[in-house]
Every structure is written in structure tokens, then in C-alpha cells.
Amino acid sequence: MGSFSITKGFFLFLAFWLPGHIGANPVYSAVSNTDLMDFKNLLDHLEEKMPVEDEVMPPQALSEQTDEAGAALSSLSEVPPWTGEVNPSQRDGGALGRGPWDPSDRSALLKSKLRALLAGPRSLRRSSCFGGRIDRIGAQSGLGCNSFRYRR
């Protein structure tokens, strides 16, 4: 019993004595105050040069841009959908001697192509969970965020 009380006393002594004398010492060397001040000055300088995202584009300007984009896309509904084929008259140069890229035909064709691209399955399904390639793999395997939306 005597050795047990001595061992117990020794461990109690170490438990109370060591925390006061042993501190956390980092493995790396300590950073001096001048280095910290230089780093802080550098960060302040960078913050002055880089504008905050909210200041760059106020929410009001963003809503105006989305309204303009919506108006531009709503005008696309007037154009018939692009089937992916070119008319024989466009291929041959037109019946009236017009080239295949007459401005009116060209704009209608481009608008219908744009609408087809925007309405395609890949442009409709966007995910913030994965990147594009991983998202497609996830959709095919049944894993991932958009697996319930689109199946091949």
C-alpha cells in the first residue's frame, strides 16, 4: 500500500506541476511581429484594390440584366424550331439567286439554333453538387444530384 500511495502522489504532483511549465510549442519557428504586420499591410492593400462582389454589380443592375435577357429570349419563341436540317433552297443558293446566308434566313436559323441549345437537356439541368462531367456520370449511374431528373 505504501508504494501505491507514493505512485499516486507522484502522478498527482506531475499532473499539477506539468501543465504550468509545459506549453504548446509549435514545430515551426514563430512568426515575428514585423512579418505579421507586413502580411496585414499586404492584405489591406489587396482589399483596397479588389472591389467587393456586391459593389461590382448591385442587385438592381442584376435584375435589369435578367429582365433584358428574358425579353431577348421571349422574342425567340416567334421563330420556328430548328430541325437540324438545311432546306434544299438554302443548300443550292436559293431560288431567287440569294445566297444561303441571307441576313433574314441567317438570323432566323441562328435564333432557332440558340433556342434548341438553350432548351436542350444539358443546358436545362445544372447542378451545384458536381462538375459537368461528374454530373453526367452520376446521372448515368443513378448516383449524384440530378439522377432523378434525367435518365438516358
Curated annotation (Swiss-Prot):
Question: Which residues belong to the propeptide?
Answer: 25-122, 92-102
Q: Where is this region: Important for degradation of atrial natriuretic peptide by IDE?
A: 146-150
Output one GO BP term. cGMP biosynthetic process
> Which residues are annotated with the PTM Phosphoserine?
128
Keywords, in A-Z order:
Cell projection, Cleavage on pair of basic residues, Disulfide bond, Hormone, Phosphoprotein, Secreted, Signal, Vasoactive, Vasodilator
Q: Secretion signal: which residues?
A: 1-24
InterPro entries given in the database record: Natr_peptide, Natr_peptide_CS, Natriuretic_peptide, Natriuretic_peptide_atrial
Give the protein's recorded name: Natriuretic peptides A
Species, as recorded: Rattus norvegicus
